[in-house]
């Protein structure tokens, strides 16, 4: 798995900082590429890492631009890893047909 792009953001809540990373991931798939997304949240308190949460959806589409659009959607709305599938589920169901078109 390769990382093609990373979008980072932070949210401050009382004495805790939550750092979000949204990664566009790429992997070889049959004779082409498949793109997915990994989301990670790191919680810091007093500059000490206290919690990490991560989730990913691999092989969303073989069309990089579509997956980049989803990456921006997640970053713009500061979606946490736990809600990744809830937010992207219908997009993933639609975009998976891109692989059939490529065959």
Predicted regions, residues:
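Compositionally biased, intrinsically disordered linkers/stalks adjacent to structured regions
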Residues: 66-103
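A short, exposed loop/beta-hairpin motif centered on an aromatic-Gly-Thr core
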Residues: 50-64, 69-74
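Aromatic side chains
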Residues: 20-22, 35, 91
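Glycine-rich loops and low-complexity Gly/Arg-rich segments
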Residues: 44-48, 61-65, 82-85
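Negatively charged, low-complexity tracts enriched in Asp/Glu with abundant Ser/Thr
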Residues: 1-23, 28
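A generic structural micro-environment signature
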Residues: 7, 30, 63-66
């Amino acid at each position: 798995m390769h990382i093609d792009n990373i979008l980072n953001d932070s949210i401050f809540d009382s004495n805790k900082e939550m750092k979000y990373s949204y990664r566009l991931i790429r992997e070889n798939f049959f004779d082409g590429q498949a793109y997915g997304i990994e989301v990670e949240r790191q919680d810091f308190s007093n500059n000490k890492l206290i919690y990490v949460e991560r989730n990913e959806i691999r092989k969303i589409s073989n069309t990089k631009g579509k997956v980049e659009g989803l990456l921006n959607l997640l970053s713009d709305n500061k979606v946490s890893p736990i809600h990744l599938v809830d937010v992207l589920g219908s997009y993933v169901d639609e975009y998976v047909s891109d692989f059939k078109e490529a065959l």
